[in-house]
């Protein structure tokens, strides 16, 4: 099968490309970029890949004629217009940006500060949280955000089994600098990041509304969450530490049972119990590892959720959606060995 990838120069696109190249069901990955005037060798755009495959100027008609699916690893605001030819043709689109994650256009406009995609397109978009949905027969798949993935996988058993007080959810999420994207800023400059930890976008991060939207799909009574984000002096990985109060009568055994049952057959979510996971054990893999503590004295449940933001939080989950859509094995093309040491 041939697939197209638009957006190879960003971190997410680079990692996705490397996984697509080794996928057993993919024979060819056609590369496109919106800013090119003519074909350009990939190694001129991304030297560390040592690959001279041509990257072509973006051409939707060429993709429709030659490929079976298209991946967009582009910034927010691109896909909502660039995807239109594919949607008209019922051609499979997997979008790694936030353009189709939110069902309410006004919510997108509020959080992304730009106009939303067409209402009709938002209605048919499929939110591809692969551990809780099936992308079979879907032609517009919105890949979840990295913070959203780590947070939702950590909260799902507690929300679905109605084990916690919904007004007490606190998420303290920390990420490596690759989560901020490739474009350098003053906050991602080495001298600012090194030997430092800095909060940013507290309660204003763009992933908050998609988290709340999915939580409400599991329990409509969810109203809001406290959500903070911290930039760490590491390259990759997310640690989301989640706190909530149990409902009266809920005990540790119920919480443990909920996590074990929810993820019993999930190939990429590993419940580690009270052995709290570290970022290092998942970087380079498509795993989400979840550790859980029940503090009876403080009457608080704590969940530690770790993922690689560029794999499970981006390209890896995109491939999971691709595998579902085209009936490949759930683990096809996905890495399971961490980058150690």
Swiss-Prot record:
- Which reaction(s) are listed as its catalytic activity? N-acetyl-L-glutamate 5-semialdehyde + phosphate + NADP(+) = N-acetyl-L-glutamyl 5-phosphate + NADPH + H(+)
- One BP annotation, GO: L-arginine biosynthetic process
User: Known Pfam families for this protein?
Assistant: Semialdhyde_dh, Semialdhyde_dhC_1
**HAMAP family named among the record's database cross-references:** ArgC_type1 (MF_00150)
EC number annotated for this UniProt entry: 1.2.1.38
Q: What is this protein called?
A: N-acetyl-gamma-glutamyl-phosphate reductase
Query: Active site annotated at which positions?
Result: 146
Q: Does the keyword Oxidoreductase apply?
A: yes
């Amino acid at each position: 099968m041939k697939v197209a990838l638009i957006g190879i120069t960003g971190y997410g696109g680079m990692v996705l490309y490397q996984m697509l190249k080794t996928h057993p069901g993919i024979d060819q990955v056609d590369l496109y970029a919106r800013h090119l005037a003519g074909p350009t060798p990939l190694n001129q755009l991304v030297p560390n890949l040592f690959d001279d495959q041509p990257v072509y100027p973006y051409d939707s008609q060429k993709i429709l004629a030659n490929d079976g699916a298209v991946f967009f690893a582009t910034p927010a605001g691109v896909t909502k217009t660039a995807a239109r030819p594919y949607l008209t043709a019922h051609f499979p689109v997997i979008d790694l940006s936030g353009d189709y994650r939110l069902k309410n256009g006004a919510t997108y406009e509020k959080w992304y500060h730009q106009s939303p995609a067409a209402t009709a397109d938002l209605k048919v978009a499929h939110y591809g949280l692969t551990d809780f949905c099936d992308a079979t027969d879907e032609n517009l798949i919105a890949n979840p955000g990295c913070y959203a993935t780590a947070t939702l996988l950590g909260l799902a058993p507690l929300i679905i089994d109605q084990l916690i007080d919904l007004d007490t959810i606190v998420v303290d999420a920390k990420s490596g600098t690759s989560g901020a994207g490739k474009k350098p800023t003053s906050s991602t400059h080495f001298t600012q990041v090194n030997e430092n930890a800095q909060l940013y976008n507290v309660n204003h991060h763009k992933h908050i509304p998609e988290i709340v939207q999915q939580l409400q799909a599991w329990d409509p009574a969810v109203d809001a969450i406290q959500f903070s984000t911290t930039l760490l002096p590491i390259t990759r990985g997310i640690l989301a530490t989640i706190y909530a109060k149990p409902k009266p009568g809920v005990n540790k055994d119920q919480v443990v049972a909920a996590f074990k049952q929810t993820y019993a057959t999930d190939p990429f979510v590993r419940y580690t119990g009270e052995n709290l996971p570290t970022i290092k054990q998942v970087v380079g893999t498509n795993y989400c590892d979840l550790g859980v503590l029940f503090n009876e004295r403080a009457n608080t449940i704590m969940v530690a959720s770790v993922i690689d933001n560029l794999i499970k939080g981006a390209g890896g989950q995109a491939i999971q959606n691709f595998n579902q859509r085209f009936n490949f094995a759930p683990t096809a093309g996905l890495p399971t060995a961490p980058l150690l040491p």
